[in-house]
């Protein structure tokens, strides 16, 4: 095919050498340009990255990709989250009097000192009644919630839409905590009195 085109060009050549040379140059120039415009036209559809204006396109692609990933991760995490988070919250909260009392010395001075203050700030407004009255329960609750929040923060770092669940998980933790806290209230009456005296 290419040689036949050349043959046609060569046949035209004797007509006017100069015109043919110009035409050959033009067609030669046009052909790569054609393929370029084709590849440019097709490449943004196939892969926006090699497009002439990378910033806007890559940003668009990145945003779309991130959105897709976040949606996928959010769906996965909502499926994972709603089952394990419930069980994790319930598991973390129900043994909260015993289990997290052991954890709290490790947790409080250790990792989440800034996290702890944030958690306390987050916890104070909503379960004020429970946290203020039950000091011993407050510590396990916060540590358990801190662990949950740390997990959520790691997820949040990956997926901003995870903001959906942290409001949920404190609410869940309050509901699931309410029972251990009530049991703990009966156990911790003396320390409540001590707190009130202090």
Curated annotation (Swiss-Prot):
Q: Which residues fall in a compositionally biased region of kind Low complexity?
A: 35-46, 56-83
Q: Where in the cell is it found?
A: Nucleus
State whether keyword Glycoprotein applies: no
| UniProt feature, compositional bias: Basic residues | 17-31
Any one Gene Ontology BP term: segmentation
Sorted alphabetically, which keywords does the UniProt record give?
Answer: Developmental protein, DNA-binding, Gap protein, Metal-binding, Nucleus, Repeat, Zinc, Zinc-finger
Task: Give the UniProt family note.
Answer: Belongs to the hunchback C2H2-type zinc-finger protein family.
**Taxonomy of the source species:** Eukaryota, Metazoa, Ecdysozoa, Arthropoda, Hexapoda
| Compositionally biased intervals (Basic and acidic residues) | 179-198
In Swiss-Prot or TrEMBL terms, this protein is called: Protein hunchback
- UniProt lists compositionally biased (Polar residues) regions at 95-105
What's this protein's function? Gap class segmentation protein that controls development of head structures.
Q: Where is this region: Disordered?
A: 16-111, 152-198
GO cellular component labels? nucleus
Single GO MF annotation: zinc ion binding
Organism equals: Drosophila lineosetae (Fruit fly)
């Amino acid at each position: 095919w290419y040689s036949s085109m050349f043959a046609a060009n060569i046949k035209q050549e004797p007509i006017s050498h100069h015109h043919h040379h110009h035409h050959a140059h033009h067609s030669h120039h046009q052909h790569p340009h054609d393929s370029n415009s084709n590849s440019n036209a097709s490449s943004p559809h196939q892969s926006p990255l090699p497009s002439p204006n990378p910033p806007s396109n890559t940003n668009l692609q990145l945003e779309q990709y991130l959105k897709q990933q976040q949606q996928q991760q959010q769906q996965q995490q909502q499926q994972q989250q709603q089952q394990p988070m419930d069980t994790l919250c319930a598991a973390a909260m129900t043994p909260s009097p015993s289990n997290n009392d052991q954890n709290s010395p490790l947790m409080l001075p250790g990792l989440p000192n800034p996290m702890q203050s944030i958690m306390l700030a987050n916890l104070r407004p909503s379960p004020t009644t429970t946290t203020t009255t039950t000091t011993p329960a407050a510590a396990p609750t916060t540590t358990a919630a801190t662990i949950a929040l740390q997990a959520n923060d790691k997820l949040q770092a990956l997926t901003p839409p995870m903001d959906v669940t942290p409001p949920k998980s404190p609410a869940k933790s309050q509901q699931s905590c309410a029972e251990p806290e009530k049991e703990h209230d009966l156990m911790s009456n003396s320390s409540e009195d001590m707190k009130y005296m202090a």
